[in-house]
Amino acid sequence: VGSEMCIRDRCHTDHTPGFGSAAKYVASTMLEIAHDTYIYQIPSVVIVEIMGRDAGWLTAASCLARNDYSPAPHLIYLPEVDFDEDQFIEDIKNVLKTSRCVIVAVSEGIHDKDGNYISATSAVADKFGHAQLSGTGKALESLVKDRMDIKVRSIELNVLQRCAAHISSRTDINESFALGQAAVKYAAEGMTAVMSTIKRVSNDPYQWIIEPENVSLIANQAKTIPLEWITPEKNDVTPEMEAYLRPLIIGEVSLQYKDGLPMYLPVNHLL
């Protein structure tokens, strides 16, 4: 019996444990980057590289940072659709017509129409044969520097997206406990080769149930964002995408602190 462990892209489940908290971190960080960027009067472009080789769920979650006063990220690029460098530059120029700065969210796995990754470094395969990507943000930073006379920087969120326990989603924590408990229950009942999964009932109010699913249908399969949740211009997500994501980041977790820092479980056995 399995209990999920993945950032997001497992098939046959609405989402996986940890995704809501990672999405909350991405959106919060994007809002904080926006605040820092707005301080300066110099026109600028900020490119934020977010995890996502084949699926752009975490990058899409950056849309949750938008509020009444901040439209950032102004542009969102996902690996589910082809990326065009010329159109990227035009998109930036269009935003600059009405905004002093442009904040871009980009998945590490974006690629051109021929399937080539937009990455400043060669892709190295991990033990599963999946490309380990890095440098996408830097590649786009160089592109903007070459094509435009404007201040530009790139930011790679990297492992922070999956280890920022200080900003966990209460919804995510509750679901994670429930999934683990269900997995133990399935094992006690003699079930095998199954995994506990989340099935969404509704968005508003957000309701869900847990059901077992055959692991053979899930293993090594990636669940990508529906194309209808990506705008025709391929540079943003739709309101349906936001409505899907929003419930997953709701709620906060109270942490205990010691000497000014969060107290986490000791990991002596890993050292």
Where is each model-derived feature located?
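Glycine-rich, charge-decorated loop segments at or immediately adjacent to ligand/cofactor-binding or catalytic sites
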Residues: R8-H15
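Acidic, glycine-rich active-site loops and adjacent beta-strand->loop/helix elements
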Residues: R8, G52-D54, V81-F83, N158-R162, ...
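Short, small-residue-biased leader/transition segments that mark boundaries at the very start
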Residues: V1-I7
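Accessory alpha-helical/coil subdomains and C-terminal extensions
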Residues: P17-R153
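C-terminal non-catalytic interaction/assembly regions of soluble proteins
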Residues: Y117-L271
